[in-house]
Amino acid sequence: MSHLRIAVTFLCTLFALTAGAGESCQVGGSAIPVGKTKQELCNLYECATDSNRVVLKKLTCAEQAVKTGCRSVPGDANAPFPDCCPTTLCRGRQWDH
């Protein structure tokens, strides 16, 4: 019985280590291997596995609701994510930047 337990443990470990091996996500004609990221304009893509499925995660700037006394300042369009995203500056804190 202990040999069976060792064999099952070995196979489960091997499967966990090879999940997603050789697989990739497609983004605009290029492939991102599982476990890697790709920077593109103001987006960051990550190819990952989730419950034995290959998934593509995309991070991009969120729209912000600007409160009274604050203003939105555009980010540098040539900067990598998240430095390309706009920031919110408010009176009394960072207004004079």
From Swiss-Prot:
Residues 1-20 form the signal peptide. The keyword Disulfide bond applies. One of its GO terms (molecular function) is toxin activity. Keywords: Disulfide bond, Secreted, Signal, Toxin. It comes from the Eukaryota. One of its GO terms (cellular component) is extracellular region. Contains 4 disulfide bonds. Expressed by the venom gland. The keyword Membrane does not apply. It is found in: Secreted. It holds the Pfam family SVWC. Negative results: this recombinant protein is not able to act on sodium channels (Nav). Belongs to the scorpion La1-like peptide family. This is Venom peptide HsVx1. It comes from Heterometrus spinifer (Asia giant forest scorpion).
